[in-house]
Amino acid sequence: MDHQLTREESQRLMHLLKLPMEQYGNFPLMRKAFLRACKIVHPDKGGSDELSQELISLYRRLEESLPCLSTQDFIETDKVCLIEKIDYLTDWINCNFENCNKCLYCRLWNNHKSDPPFPKVWGYCLCYKCYIIWFGLEPCHFAFQSWMQIIALTPFCA
């Protein structure tokens, strides 16, 4: 990840994509916004050449910094899909201290702990703790609800 964007570049990219910073790392949504923004800022459509080049440059650098996704990077959905309703969090106390391993929160946290010890990046690790660290949020109900919405819209490999 040696071409990773700085915080200012990430904020600039999200501004150009017209997306809130909370959606940084939601790559399918960012891709759609990028394609839409390219049509708007393209010089042939009345946009600025500098703005178009900046958008493409930032987005290309972001894509280059993404790790290659393999089947090992995904949780196994056959275990999750056996449950009709996915439990995001079984019990806050049990999930934080005993690791119930039944809810999605614990499965992602266990995946976080089992990965190699290099620095974790939101988008590579989808656990709640990486989410709040990456976005600089305080652990609270609003942050948890926001994380759940992003996880619900994230496609997982089956």
UniProtKB/Swiss-Prot annotation:
Annotated positions of the N-acetylmethionine modification: M1
Domain J: start-end pairs: 12-75
GO-annotated molecular function: zinc ion binding
GO cellular component: host cell cytoplasm; host cell nucleus
Keywords in alphabetical order: Acetylation, Activator, Early protein, Host cytoplasm, Host nucleus, Host-virus interaction, Metal-binding, Oncogene, Phosphoprotein, Transcription, Transcription regulation, Zinc, Zinc-finger
Superkingdom to which the source organism belongs: Viruses
Zn-finger segments (C4-type): 95-106
InterPro entries named among the record's database cross-references: DnaJ_domain, J_dom_sf, Papo_T_antigen, Papo_T_antigensf
Record's subcellular location: Host cytoplasm; Host nucleus
Keyword Metal-binding set for record: yes
SMART domains: DnaJ
Gene3D superfamilies associated with the record: DnaJ domain, Small t-antigen, unique domain
Zinc finger (H1C3-type): 112-130
Job description of the protein: Promotes efficient viral genome replication by accelerating both G1 and S phase progression of the cell cycle. Inhibits host PP2A by binding to the A subunit, thereby displacing lower affinity regulatory B subunit. Inactivation of PP2A in turn results in the transactivation of cyclin A and cyclin D1 promoters. Late during the infection cycle, ST may induce dephosphorylation of host MTOR, leading to the inhibition of cap-dependent translation. May establish and maintain high levels of viral genomes during persistent infection in cell culture.
Free-text domain note: The common region of ST and LT proteins comprises the J domain. This domain is essential for multiple viral activities, including virion assembly, viral DNA replication, transformation and transcriptional activation. This domain is also required for cyclin A-transactivating activity of ST.
Record note on quaternary structure: Interacts with host PPP2R1A; the interaction inhibits PP2A activity.
Protein name: Small t antigen
